[in-house]
Curated annotation (Swiss-Prot):
Its EC number is 1.5.1.5, 3.5.4.9. It holds the Pfam family THF_DHG_CYH. The gene is folD. GO terms for cellular component: cytosol. This is Bifunctional protein FolD.
């Protein structure tokens, strides 16, 4: 039997650990840490995600404000709102919900949001600190993967790890976090010619390729740890599936994350943790 790495359970633990930190912050500074979310347009899925983030904030005692902008919002108008949030001392974390309407530049957003308030840890400034080994916060999804490994006491030090995917959101920061945990890391991508050969040598494989059901049993060695970051609505019967053919892992992998219920729940939990951490850092050092 493959051990199911339950991200919902780990996320619950992370949220519970934040409750006393939020309460202490309130007691000390007279307000709760605040996450401000900016959403542009009427994408239904995005609005559901934003609503879930607000609910998650409120459940642990944080506050969340949602800035809902019409689809025709100009780049200048969006930039003005982000600048205002950057300069608002009552705002600790800023999150811009992607995707943006096509006429808006995500590049501009990633340049403009202050690293000191970047709750996602994905702006260019934030990633600069991160890759220099001086992170203000870590990108949410890779940090969530590390929390899962920690929760289940899965050893990383000295292990061979492969990360499939090289995005700034998951792949590259994931490789760095594993390296800092003293794993020997190989980063694979769409141009890797011998990917299956490499993944079959790994003790731990993190798959963030963005391609549904890309890897299966034949791509992993016996008793490997498999972390599936992918999420797609193209599974059998329209069900959610990941980048890994999960049903093939039973009796082969030692442990694996399911989709849904694996890495996904960790992303919001780490967003809350990042916001709390940024609030604490800003409160300790007003010049931060």
């Amino acid at each position: 039997m493959v051990l199911i790495l339950d991200g919902k359970e780990v996320a619950k633990e992370v949220r519970a650990s934040l409750v006393p930190r939020v309460a202490k912050f309130k007691e000390t500074y007279g307000r709760a840490p605040q996450l401000s979310v900016v959403i542009v347009g009427d994408d239904k899925a995005s609005h559901v995600y934003v609503k879930n983030k607000k609910i998650a904030c409120e459940k642990i005692g944080m506050t969340s404000t949602i800035h809902t902008l019409p689809a025709e919002t100009t780049q200048s108008e969006l930039n003005q709102i982000l600048s205002k949030l950057n300069n608002d001392n009552g705002v600790d974390g800023i999150l811009v919900q992607f995707p943006l309407p096509k006429h808006l530049s995500s590049d501009e957003v990633l340049k403009l949001v202050s690293a000191e308030k970047d709750a996602d840890g994905l702006t260019y400034e934030s990633l600069g600190y991160f890759f220099a080994g001086k992170p203000l916060v870590s990108p949410c999804t890779p940090a969530g993967v590390m929390e899962i490994l920690k929760h289940y006491r899965i050893p990383v030090e000295g292990k061979k790890a492969v990360v499939v995917g090289r995005s700034n959101i998951v792949g590259k920061p994931m490789a760095l976090l594993l390296t800092e945990a003293n794993a020997t890391v190989t980063l694979c991508h769409s141009k890797t010619s011998n990917m299956s050969e490499l993944t079959k040598q790994a003790d731990l494989v993190v798959v963030a390729a963005g391609k549904a059901r890309l890897l299966g049993k034949e791509d992993f060695k016996k008793d490997a740890i498999v972390i599936d970051v992918g999420m797609h609505g193209s599974g059998q019967g329209g069900k959610l599936c990941g980048d890994v053919r999960f049903e093939e892992l039973d009796g082969w992998a030692k442990a694996a994350t399911p989709v849904p219920g694996g890495v996904g729940p960790m992303t919001i939990a780490m967003l809350l943790k990042n916001t709390c951490q940024l609030a604490e850092q800003r409160a300790r050092d007003p010049q931060f």
